[in-house]
Amino acid sequence: LDGLREATAGANRITGQQKLEGKFDDVKLPYLGYADYQGGGVELKTKWDKGAGTDKPAASSLPKEIMWSHLTQIAGYWHMTDVWPTIVYANRLGYRVFKPTLEQLQAGVAAIREACMRRERLLAAASSPEELLRLCDPQWDHMYVWRDLPPAILEQAHKIWRS
């Protein structure tokens, strides 16, 4: 809570999650995001204990700078709202608050725009959902995307990508 208090200091009212929608130059489809607090002005990232289910849990470390995936997220919110974002990283021992630079935000917006344009090209190139999936890397080794899916879903995914 201390990190959120610091990030929202001076606010007369604190607002929770809000759906944001905007556009990027040369991108036809809308860009969507769900901001945590203050209409995109404050994003909270929690770092949970490692080994939480054991008798020796260890607090995950807090980053020393904004992580790239989180920077692109808040840069998208900034692009849509013109609200300068703050990001709070918190674990059970403490927190860190970061405000990105203009250069960081601009780099994040450029990366989002490029990714959106690439996705639109993939959508245009595919004639079916299955073909679209085959154009993408399934990332079978991703740490959580495929982890807890029912076997029937995994089997269907393997059929799509391996055909």
Task: Indicate where each model-derived feature is located.
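Conserved catalytic cores of phosphodiester-cleaving nucleases, focusing on short active-site segments
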Residues: G16, G33-S61, G76-Y77
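Short, catalytically relevant binding-site loops at active-site mouths
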Residues: G22-K23, W48-K50, L93-G94
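Short secondary-structure capping micro-motifs at structural edges
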Residues: K23-D25, Q73-G76
